[in-house]
């Protein structure tokens, strides 16, 4: 299969829409049918212009997920792994942002935004489980959730 454009042009087109990790960009170019030499050359050029930077991508992605409350702790690490970010880079990005974001504040904001009328003490078991599981899927530890809901009043 002969590609219509070169890998460099395709990489630029992809990066003009959104940020990619290097591994994700490599996968996208492979799906487009480019051979490994073309892909490596395109990625090298992207790195030289700083268009692809896994550290920057990990920080941006982690900041977005933390700010929105979509992932914390293990869920955040799992998301970065899913985006093909190496563990050491992901851990560094998460550690750098720990000072900026407090899990307690993220939890409080998320609960106020997502469940404004929820009261853990008066809620029935089904509602408690629903809210608790929603927050667990976002990476909050059970101990943190129990502490938050016991101090909520």
UniProtKB/Swiss-Prot annotation:
Q: Which GO terms of the cellular component aspect does the record hold?
A: cytoplasm
Q: Where would you find this protein in the cell? A: Cytoplasm
Offer one Pfam family short name for this entry. RecX_HTH1
Q: Does the keyword Cytoplasm apply?
A: yes
Protein keywords: Cytoplasm
List residues traversing the bilayer. Answer: none
Recorded hits in InterPro entries, A to Z, give: RecX_HTH_1st, Regulatory_RecX, WH-like_DNA-bd_sf
Keyword Cytoplasm among record annotations? yes
Gene Ontology process terms (BP): regulation of DNA repair
Main subcellular location: cytoplasm
Identify the domain of life. Bacteria
Function comment: Modulates RecA activity.
Task: Say which family it is in.
Answer: Belongs to the RecX family.
Protein name per Swiss-Prot or TrEMBL: Regulatory protein RecX
């Amino acid at each position: 299969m002969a590609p219509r454009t070169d890998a460099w042009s395709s990489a630029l087109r992809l990066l003009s829409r959104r940020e990619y990790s290097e591994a994700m960009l490599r996968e996208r170019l492979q799906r487009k049918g480019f051979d490994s030499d073309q892909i490596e050359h395109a990625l090298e050029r992207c790195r030289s212009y700083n268009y692809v930077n896994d550290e920057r991508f990990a920080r941006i992605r982690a900041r977005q997920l933390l700010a929105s409350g979509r992932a914390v702790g293990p869920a955040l690490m799992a998301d970065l792994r899913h985006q093909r970010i190496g563990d050491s880079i992901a851990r560094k990005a998460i550690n750098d942002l720990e000072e900026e974001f407090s899990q307690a504040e993220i939890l409080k904001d998320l609960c106020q935004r997502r469940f404004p009328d929820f009261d853990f003490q008066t809620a029935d078991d089904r509602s408690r489980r629903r809210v608790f599981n929603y927050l667990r899927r976002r990476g909050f530890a059970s101990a943190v959730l129990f502490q938050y809901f016991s101090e909520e009043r």
